[in-house]
Each structure stands twice: as C-alpha cells, then as structure tokens.
C-alpha cells in the first residue's frame, strides 16, 4: 500500500517534468521588421555589416564585385569589379580588411576596407562558398556538410567539423555564413543552398541548434531557380539583414531565440538539467520516503516470514536481456 502511495505521488511529478523537458518545442521564427531596396542585378554571394554599412560580394564570371551599400536605401556607395575569370563568393570583415572567397579559383582575396583594393591573398584547396570571423577563427564552408576552422593570419586549416542534425544526419550544401557571439560561445548562422531555411549551429562540434523557415520571405522573390535565399548580416542583438541572389529587396528581420542563446539558454544536447521542477520535487520526495519507510519495513518482515515457507526450487530470478548494440550536385553557386 505504501509503495502504491509512493508511486502515485511520484508518477505525475515525473510525467510533468518529462513533458516540460521534451514535449515543448523551441520556436525558431523569422519575423519581418522592414523591407528595403536591393539591386536585383546583384548575384549576392556574401553579406556583412560593418560600421553601419553593408558590404556585399556578387558572383558570376564577368559580373563579380565587392561593394559597400547603404542598407536603408539600398544605394551602392562604392564598388569594385573583379577580373572576369573570378567567381566571387562569401566575404567577412577581419580587422581593417575584407576577406573574399572564390568559387573554384582556390584563392581568397584580402581587400583593404578603406579603398577596396586587393592587398594580399591566400590559397586553399577545393571550392569556397561562405566565410565568417568569430572573433578568433575564420569559419569557412565549401558547399558540403564540412566546415573548416582556419587561422585568420595564415588561412591554415586548424580543424574540420561536420554539421549534423539531431539524428546525426549530415546537413549538406551549407553556403553563406554569419558568425554570432553569444554567452554560450561562438555560433554560426548558415544559408542552405537552394533551400528556404537558415540554420544555427555550434562550430565547436557541428551540432544543429536551430532551424529557421524563411519560405515566407523567399516566396516574395521566387523569380528563378538560381535566385535563392543567400546573405545574412548581423545588425544588432537578434536583428539581421537577409537577402538573396538577384532579389529586388533586402529585409531587416528578427530571428527568435538568437537572443535566447545570448542569455545562456540551452537548446539541444544539454549536459545539465536546469529545470526548476527538478528542484521543486526534492522536498516532496523526502517527505514521501520518510512516510513510506515504516510501512516498507513492516511489509519486508511479513514477506520474509512467508518466503521461508516456499520451496527453494520455486525461486525465480528475472533475467536482463542483452543490450542490442547501436548499430552534391552544384551548377554555379
């Protein structure tokens, strides 16, 4: 009887705790704040905000450029065109320079941000897609699920991580990147090529932290198979500028739960349980155990007497079952 009372008290408590931990989804939403003009001839490859201006790289052979843009009016403040053999890709600001990747040239160009002239370059192997700077390292994508962490001074690869979802599946076609500094550590927002979504992942281990549906914004600009969502620039706090290839608009949006990360909230794969319900049930558990102990001892004594009368051959030992062991196409980014 005491055991039944004990379980009847514990069951609803643990059920409520389990529901609060696992059944309540974390919302990731893109909220449109304002819409602004964007040059629809710009095949956007990279987007970065610095000192109030948007820096944008545009791609395609013969049309690649680096430009400074007023985000509110969309007007180009200054621009530099690149050699027709260069297909520009993602960019990031590092100190007083802008680092620009190229698609297949295996060269990253370094521009002086003051006059947009090339001052140096780095070589790398494979394709270049997106890049961002997290305050310590350069983080670079190549259109697969692999992300390289690089030294900003030498461009050498320090390590490579694979971006995966909560089931361990690789997330491919990772494109333009935007690094975000949070209290939990560096985080990266990424466009997925030809997909209306932006993901948030941890660059230290590649784990997916958030998935944002941007289809409502992409639908406003669905005028070609290559005119896809591409370009994320951090404005402030949870606000970001986003646009796409040959889009006629750029959007200031709020991305929910980005600020939540900054407040130290835990999204997935948390090592500690900080649910206040766990703390609240401790006094109840102690009271229940104290109340149940006398009855449990009385039951144990009665059971031992009865067991002495049972033939030893009738003893049954529950067997534990053996544990079962857990067993890119691209046509011009």
What are these regions (language model features)?
Residues 70-74, 112-116, 152-155, 202-206, ...:
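Short loop/turn segments that connect beta-strands within beta-propeller blades
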Residues 22-40, 72-75:
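A short helix->beta-strand "capping" segment at the edge of beta-propeller domains
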Residues 44, 174-176, 225-233:
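Signature of short aromatic-glycine-proline-rich micro-motifs recurring in repeat-based ectodomains
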Residues 1-20, 177, 268-333:
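Secretory targeting signatures
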Residues 35-40, 80-84, 120-125, 161-171, ...:
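Surface loop/turn motifs at the tips and blade-to-blade linkers of beta-strand repeat domains
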Residues 33-65, 80-81, 85-92:
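Beta-strand-rich domains and repeat architectures in extracellular enzymes and scaffolds
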Residues 55-61, 93, 98-105, 138-145, ...:
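Conserved beta-strand positions in repeat-built beta-propeller and related beta-rich domains
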């Amino acid at each position: 009887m005491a055991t039944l009372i004990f379980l009847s008290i514990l069951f609803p408590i643990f059920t409520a705790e389990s529901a609060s931990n696992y059944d309540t989804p974390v919302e990731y939403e893109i909220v449109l704040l304002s819409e602004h003009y964007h040059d629809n001839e710009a095949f956007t490859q990279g987007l970065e905000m610095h000192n109030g201006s948007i820096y944008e790289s545009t791609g395609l052979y013969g049309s690649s450029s680096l430009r400074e843009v007023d985000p509110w009016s969309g007007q180009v403040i200054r621009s530099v065109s690149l050699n027709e053999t260069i297909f520009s890709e993602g960019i990031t600001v590092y100190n007083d320079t802008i680092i620009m990747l190229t698609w297949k040239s295996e060269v990253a160009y370094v521009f002086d941000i003051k006059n947009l002239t090339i001052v140096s370059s780095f070589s790398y192997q494979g394709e270049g897609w997106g890049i961002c700077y997290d305050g310590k390292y350069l983080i670079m994508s190549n259109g697969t699920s692999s992300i390289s962490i690089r030294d900003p001074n030498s461009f050498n690869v320090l390590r490579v991580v694979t971006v995966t979802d909560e089931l361990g599946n690789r997330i491919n076609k990772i494109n333009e990147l935007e690094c975000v500094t949070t209290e939990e550590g560096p985080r990266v927002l990424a466009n997925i090529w030809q997909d209306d979504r932006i993901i948030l992942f941890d660059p230290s281990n590649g784990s997916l932290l958030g998935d944002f549906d941007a289809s409502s914004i992409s639908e406003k600009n669905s005028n070609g198979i290559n005119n896809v969502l591409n370009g994320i620039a951090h404005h402030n706090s949870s606000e970001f500028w986003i646009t796409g290839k040959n889009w006629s608009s750029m959007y200031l949006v709020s991305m929910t739960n980005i600020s939540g990360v900054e407040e130290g909230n835990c999204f997935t794969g948390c090592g500690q349980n900080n649910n206040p319900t766990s703390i609240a049930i401790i006094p109840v558990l102690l009271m229940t155990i104290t109340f149940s102990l006398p009855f449990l001892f009385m039951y144990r004594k009665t059971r031992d007497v009865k067991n002495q009368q049972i033939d030893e051959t009738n003893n049954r030992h529950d067997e534990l079952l053996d544990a079962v062991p857990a067993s890119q196409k691209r046509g011009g980014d």
